[in-house]
């Protein structure tokens, strides 16, 4: 499968990188192209490690089968299934529940958001909703106890029960 990881804003890099890592780690037969929006992202930290472009034309020519977007818009004329990845907890934002008709699928981060978007999917009838979790948070779960020994050492050395760093 040809996949585009679409980064219009710098924060999108950390949200999409777990997808790149998963494909690489699992040796999956997918080809990934990152789109980096140059006016908003002046440096791409993985530039020497992954295939990437600043050109929408190159994205189009790549003929993606799926485009992952942690943002609100993606050019409608690009080929492939367009997937919006929700990545925060800002349900109070006025535009959070607006359906802009750019996306075929919405990946939601939890039951609260999933239920709201499923109701919208029934109303609009032209997109799907899938609860996937929040890939940017996966690191926390995977490394939850990685620093326990360091924590205990700091507490012992400081003579404190808790520390706020």
Question: Model-derived features: where do they sit?
Answer:
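Active-site and donor-binding regions of nucleotide-sugar-utilizing enzymes
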Residues: 4-148, 154-155
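Conserved donor-binding/catalytic core segment of Leloir-type glycosyltransferases
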Residues: 158-165
């Amino acid at each position: 499968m040809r996949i585009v990881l679409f980064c219009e804003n710098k924060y999108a890099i950390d949200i999409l990188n777990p997808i790149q890592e998963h494909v690489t780690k699992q040796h999956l037969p997918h080809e990934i192209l990152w789109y980096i929006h140059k006016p908003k992202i002046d440096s791409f930290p993985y530039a020497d490690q992954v295939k990437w472009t600043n050109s929408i034309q190159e994205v189009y020519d790549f003929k993606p089968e799926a485009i992952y977007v942690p943002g609100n818009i993606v050019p409608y004329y690009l080929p492939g299934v367009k997937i919006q990845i929700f990545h925060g907890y800002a349900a109070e934002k006025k535009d959070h529940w607006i359906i802009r008709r750019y996306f075929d699928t919405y990946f939601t981060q939890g039951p609260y958001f999933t239920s709201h978007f499923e109701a919208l999917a029934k109303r609009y009838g032209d997109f799907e909703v899938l609860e996937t979790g929040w890939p940017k948070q996966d690191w926390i779960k995977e490394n939850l106890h990685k620093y326990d020994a360091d924590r205990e050492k700091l507490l012992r050395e400081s003579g404190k029960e808790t520390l706020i760093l």
